[in-house]
Structures are given as structure tokens and as C-alpha cells.
A protein has these predicted regions:
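Extracytoplasmic ligand-binding site segments that recognize negatively charged/polar headgroups
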Residues: 46-58, 74-81, 96, 100-257
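N-terminal signal peptide c-region/cleavage motif recognized by signal peptidases
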Residues: 21-23
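Mature extracytoplasmic/periplasmic domains
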Residues: 301, 306-375
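Hydrophobic residues within well-ordered alpha-helices
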Residues: 86, 113, 259-264, 310
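Conserved C-terminal helix/tail region of periplasmic/extracytoplasmic solute-binding proteins
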Residues: 261, 368-401
């Protein structure tokens, strides 16, 4: 391990949690740190964000300095690739030397691995910085209605927002029911990603919350009867909206970045995003004009937490725990909250921090391209993962040529 004098403030902070721990827990964590030294942690994560990749590069430098852990990001196009890999290794009897140590995961992918018993843990409560997490938030205790139970550790939150260019449109719909009328007045100026992409399904699920006769049914595993009743108003609503979408609703962008490119190119004026800071970051990078604004629908929008999980057969579990713990450190969370990094709210309970730690967050500046913090406080829980699967399948049957 490098000498403490060579550590940055963030790296030192990753170790200070030991001071506040009970002796037995401190001894256990010290053992984790010892085993982690020299380990190479392979972190499978969606690699479609330059901001995320840059942030993980910063995290890599910090855990190398504080704990002699080498973090290697393995970029994925879809987290399902990691799930498939772990399942394949289980089938092949590769139970002790898996190729994945840590996964950025949530929702259906977490549910799939947890259901099969393919996750290591529970481990989250063993992390010193876990005591700082804002456990009062439902989206941190439940992942798409599935109890987390310590098998994954949160590191950031996200919420569905809508981004528009105020230079071209002054008023945007703040209620799902108003989208068809708005689209009729602005034909071709709104779209959302295809439903094979999580953002496309999220937009439809947001509409379901507003239109279903009983939104509470979305918190339970889907049944054929419940699906038919809940989605009947959705299909009627979409029939009104579709003709006025970009390219008449016959084509959809493949992903969030592809959708944003349409906004950059002036092909659309309004789009959904699951990252409240994405527009602000794009403005600062010179990719979107300063006239861009971000809004949240009245009554709240879907929100969730991003987690990291450790496969049952990870070869470097101790190193993976060190990385997960560092992601929860006040220094790492404050860095993630900066627009030059990721932006967005922390998963920490600020009341659990010291005055010096809270100051890291209070120094953050609110930009006009982000929604006001108060608008992000009303978070709707994600539906049970089975709804997304059924919704995507029904969509493809109805609208795929």
C-alpha cells in the first residue's frame, strides 16, 4: 500500500470510516482491506456515458492510492450481458474464479441474479460507509419492488425528467395526459427511445402510472388480467400521440444518447431523460444550447437508485467491497454530484455527515439547466420488473413491422 502521505483527501476519507466503527466491525473491515491489497477488480458497467467513464477513472485512481486496488472498467452496451455471463459461468461450474467482480446493476438484471442465487452477500451492511446511506428512501431499500437485502450497494440516484429547448417552445406538457395535444401543436418534435432501451420502457411506465385505473397494481408481479386492464388506457392514449411523434412514430432512436443527438441537431424539441443532470452537462460540454431546460412532471416521476453488486463467484470479492465502500464515501459522492463529473443528488443522509463533509455538498452550485431540487423530491417507485418485460413484448407485437 502507498504511504498515507501520498494519498489525496478523497483516498484518506475512504479509510476514515474505520474510526467510527465498533471494534469487531473495524477488525472485520481491516481484514477486508488486507485481502483487497493487490487485487484487480473487474467492474462491468454500461459504457455509453463519457461522464461515467471519466468518473470511474477518477475512482480508480483513488482506490489505487488508498487501498492498492486496481479497478478495471469493462464497458457494456447492456447490463444484461453481465447477467448472461454470470449465468453461463454457473452452468459451466465456474464457481470460484468468475470473470466479473462488480456490476453496475438495478431493476430486472438485479432481480434475475438474486432470484437465481447468483449474488454474493449480503455484503452492504459490512461496508463502513453504509451507515451514511439515506435508508429512508424507498428506492434505496427496494430495487424495482425487489428488496435489496444487502445484496447490492447504492451509489447514485436517477429520476425521469423531460428536456426541451426553450428557444423554440415556451410551454411543455407537465402531465402525461397533455402529451397528445402538445404533440399535435408541435408535430414531429417529440420522441422517446425504442422500448428495447430502458428509457423507452420507462416513458411508457410513467404513462401507465398516470393512466392505469389502479396504479398500485404496478407494484405487484404482472398477471395477464391486470396487464390488460392497466394498459387499455395506455394504448388508447398512445394511439392519439403516435401520429405526431418524430417520423410519425414509425421509427425511434436506439438509445438516450441517440435521442439527445436529435435534440442537438434540431430535429426534436422535447425528449425524456433518466438523468436530471444530463442536459446541464451537455450544455457545459458545448453540445446543447444554453436555452435548454429540464422539467419534472406534476405529481412526480419514476425514480430509482443505481447499485453495485458482486457476483457469487467473483474472484476478487474483497477488492470489490473496497470499491463499493469508496463509492459511498462523502468525497466520492460529492465528486459525483458535481456537473463536471455526473451531477445529481447523493444517496447519503447529509444529517449523518460531519460539518466538513456536509460542506462538500453545500458548495455545489445549482445550474439553470437542471430542475430545482424541490422538483426531484417526489419520486414514484419503479414498477415490478415483470411489467417492463410484458410491456416491451406487447409493444413489439403492436408496433414492430
Amino acid at each position: 500500500m502507498r504511504a498515507p502521505a501520498a494519498m489525496g483527501g478523497a483516498a484518506v476519507g475512504a479509510l476514515l470510516g474505520l474510526l467510527a466503527m465498533r471494534p469487531a466491525m473495524a477488525s472485520s473491515w481491516a481484514s477486508v482491506l488486507t485481502r483487497a491489497r493487490g487485487q484487480h477488480v473487474y467492474f462491468d458497467a454500461w459504457g455509453g456515458s463519457e461522464r461515467f467513464n471519466a468518473y470511474i477513472a477518477w475512482v480508480s485512481r483513488q482506490v489505487a492510492a488508498c487501498c492498492d486496488v486496481t479497478l478495471r472498467e469493462v464497458p457494456l452496451e447492456d447490463t444484461a450481458q453481465a447477467v448472461t455471463q454470470v449465468i453461463a459461468e454457473k452452468a459451466a461450474g465456474q464457481n470460484h474464479a468468475g470473470t466479473i467482480d462488480l456490476i453496475w446493476i438495478n431493476g430486472p438484471n438485479f432481480a434475475a441474479l438474486k432470484r437465481r442465487g447468483l449474488l454474493y452477500g449480503p455484503f452492504a451492511q459490512r461496508l463502513p460507509n453504509d451507515r451514511l446511506v439515506r435508508r429512508s428512501d424507498r428506492e434505496i431499500r427496494y430495487d424495482f419492488t425487489v428488496p435489496v437485502d444487502g445484496y447490492e450497494s447504492p451509489w447514485r440516484t436517477a429520476q425521469l425528467v423531460f428536456v426541451y429547448d426553450s428557444a423554440y417552445v415556451k410551454h411543455v406538457p407537465l402531465d402525461i395526459r397533455a402529451f397528445p395535444a402538445w404533440a399535435r401543436r408541435h408535430p414531429g418534435r417529440f420522441t422517446f427511445p425504442q422500448v428495447q432501451n430502458f428509457l423507452g420502457v420507462a416513458f411508457l411506465e410513467q404513462a401507465l402510472y398516470a393512466l392505469a385505473p389502479d396504479p398500485a397494481v404496478l407494484q405487484r408481479p404482472v398477471t395477464s388480467a391486470a396487464f390488460a386492464q392497466a394498459t387499455a388506457p395506455l394504448w388508447a392514449w398512445f394511439a392519439e400521440l403516435r401520429p405526431y411523434l418524430w417520423r410519425h412514430g414509425r421509427e425511434y432512436p436506439a438509445s438516450g444518447p441517440a435521442e439527445r443527438q436529435l435534440l442537438e441537431d434540431g430535429e426534436i424539441d422535447l425528449m425524456p431523460s433518466f438523468d436530471p443532470a444530463s442536459a446541464a452537462a451537455a450544455v457545459l460540454a458545448g453540445r446543447l444550447p444554453k436555452s435548454v431546460r429540464t422539467v419534472v412532471l406534476r405529481g412526480g416521476t419514476l425514480g430509482n437508485a443505481s447499485f453495485v453488486a458482486i457476483p457469487y463467484n467473483a474472484a476478487h470479492k474483497a477488492g470489490a467491497m473496497v470499491v463499493a465502500n469508496f463509492l459511498l464515501s462523502p468525497a466520492a459522492q460529492a465528486r459525483a454530484g458535481e456537473l463536471r463529473a455526473l451531477g445529481g443528488p447523493t444517496v447519503l443522509d447529509l444529517k449523518a455527515l460531519t460539518a466538513a463533509q456536509r460542506a462538500l455538498f453545500q458548495a455545489q452550485v445549482h445550474d439553470p439547466w437542471m430542475p430545482p431540487p424541490a422538483a426531484l423530491r417526489h419520486v414514484l417507485p419503479e414498477p415490478n420488473p415483470s411489467w417492463a418485460v410484458r410491456l416491451a413484448a406487447a409493444w413489439e407485437r403492436r408496433y414492430t413491422p
